[in-house]
Amino acid sequence: MNIIYEDNHILAVSKTCHEIVQADKTGDEPLSETLKRLIKERDQKPGNVFLGVTHRLDRPTTGVVLFAKTSKALERLNRMFATGEVHKTYWCIVPNVWGEFESLKVREFESTPQTPQTLQTSALRNQTPPQEADLTHWLVRNEKQNRSYAYDERPLDRQGNPLKDAKEARLHYEVIATTERYALLEVKLYTGRHHQIRCQLSYIGLTIKGDLKYGAPRSNPDGGISLHSRRAEFIHPVSKEPVTIVAPVPDDTLWQAIAPV
């Protein structure tokens, strides 16, 4: 258990790919219950421990997970997540389809910032995606398969009407580092949809390493996928001070080699 931030109202952990945030059909103990027991023993609390779940992170995904230690913080954080006031940044490892990568140090000092392309990905079929872009798709979730499907345009139902279950999904990605075989992307979400990063990136040919569900050729040794919730930034719901929480990357050879120091 790696607690990376804690105060009187908020607790954040760096989740591993083996941990679940909330109870599911597996029957495995969720992080919320593990943390309650830890706090009760550590702080010698006589009664029940309050710990509210503010958001979820897929089981095979690693990184920052926020919990609320008070009902006031839970109510406010839930509202902040709903209104997009909690800004989360993800890192993920995908195949390096670009070859030699332009130096980040050179790009930092360009006098004119480059505006990322906004892509409707029908234009990307059989082409190499740009190193930085905004993606927009329509996602449809299949509950039985527990996966989502991406479409360039909003799909229609059998009557020819826009499919009600289709949700617009938007994100920004940028290549920030490479090795010979892999690239590290930084991803920021404009919307929060089911498996959004996994689905949208795989749709343009950038399947996350180890993500068999979305087309990766093989699993990772630890059973997880190379998608990491790197950073959460928000205004503290009680103190109103800015908070930035950063989760260290997983302790494996590839992450340690590719992630910027």
What are these regions (language model features)?
Residues 1-261:
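RNA pseudouridine synthases
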